[in-house]
């Protein structure tokens, strides 16, 4: 079984130390195989904020697949924004803005949806859509196929439509046809799992809240997701289940920070059955 810790919008510079420590403790307890960090790692893309973020992820004890968010490009330093927008990010997290993590039962594909000429809105190009689709097509049936973006590919509330990833419809159509199971994102600090219908095959958009920042929504505390993929993850012996090889399932767990307990606690579990031919 593979365990993925999905965190987002850490916004270092606004982090809460006790929440940071609670998340480090959760990672030590759950021992993820990989950590996915879906952007807005810093608040203002300052070198000290990137250093603090890197020190934090180094404590999580697993390989990290990170993509930048709009906050990870300098906002007020226009020269840096226009000439070397990702230089500070690269010093901390490497120059590969679209990393790929491949294991026998897991494929994670990062997509850089930020643009230096945009303030906060994200987009995915036709070239990026095709690159991801090619990687998905080559994946094995045993692999959970995960795409990571920053801005959401689907939303649950009308007020969040303005934050939708530009090009999301074309991306979801192509990635579904190519075999994607999950599209992970952040940006709006609101956690949810949303099934996508009317596509070539089943696909779920999985959003994470803000992991450790004080910039929380009133209705959404600090939260992260834990994904469990494999036969053992479901613990469900239902002979009527169809559409998966050997009953493989994926559990998507939402873990919220409980202030009275000073710890992350599991608050929701969504079981999904990725389709396999």
Label each residue range with its predicted role.
Residues 6-8, 35-40, 64-70, 112, ...:
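Active-site neighborhood of phospho(di)ester-bond hydrolases with catalytic His/Asp-centered motifs
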Residues 13-15, 43-48, 70-81, 115-120, ...:
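Active-site environment of divalent metal-dependent phosphoester hydrolases
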Residues 160-241:
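Conserved beta-sheet core of the metallophosphoesterase superfamily
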Residues 141-156:
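Short acidic, glycine-rich surface-loop motifs adjacent to enzyme active sites
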Residues 1-59, 75-76, 131, 137:
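N-terminal active-site segment of His-dependent metallophosphoesterases
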Residues 229-277:
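A short C-terminal boundary segment appended to hydrolase-like catalytic domains
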Residues 51-131, 174-176, 199, 226:
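Extended active-site neighborhood of metal-dependent phosphoesterases/phosphodiesterases
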Residues 1-5, 99-110, 140-144, 198-204:
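Beta-strand-turn-beta hairpins that frame and shape the catalytic cleft
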């Amino acid at each position: 079984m593979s365990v993925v810790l999905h965190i987002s919008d850490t916004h270092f510079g606004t982090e809460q130390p006790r929440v940071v420590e609670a998340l480090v403790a959760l990672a030590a307890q759950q021992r993820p195989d990989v950590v996915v960090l879906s952007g807005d790692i810093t608040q203002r893309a300052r070198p000290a904020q990137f250093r603090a973020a890197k020190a934090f992820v180094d404590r999580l004890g697993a390989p990290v697949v990170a993509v930048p968010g709009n906050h990870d490009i300098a906002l007020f330093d226009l020269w840096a924004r226009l000439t070397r927008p990702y230089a500070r990010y690269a010093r901390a997290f490497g120059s590969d803005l679209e990393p790929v993590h491949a294991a026998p039962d897991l494929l994670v594909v990062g997509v850089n949806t930020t643009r230096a000429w945009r303030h906060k809105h994200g987009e995915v190009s036709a070239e990026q859509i095709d690159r991801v689709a090619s990687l998905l097509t080559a994946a094995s049936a045993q692999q959970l196929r995960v795409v990571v973006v920053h801005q959401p590919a689907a939303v649950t509330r009308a007020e969040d439509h303005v934050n939708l990833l530009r090009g999301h419809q074309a991306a979801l159509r192509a990635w579904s046809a190519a075999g994607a199971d999950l599209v992970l994102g952040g940006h709006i600090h609101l956690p949810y799992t949303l099934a996508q219908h009317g596509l070539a095959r089943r696909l779920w958009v999985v959003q994470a809240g803000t992991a450790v920042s004080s910039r929380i929504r009133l209705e959404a505390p600090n939260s992260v997701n834990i994904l469990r993929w494999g036969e053992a993850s479901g613990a469900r012996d239902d002979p009527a289940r169809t559409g998966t090889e050997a009953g493989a399932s994926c559990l998507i767990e939402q873990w919220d920070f409980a202030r009275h307990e000073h710890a992350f606690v599991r608050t929701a579990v969504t079981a999904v059955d990725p389709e396999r031919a």
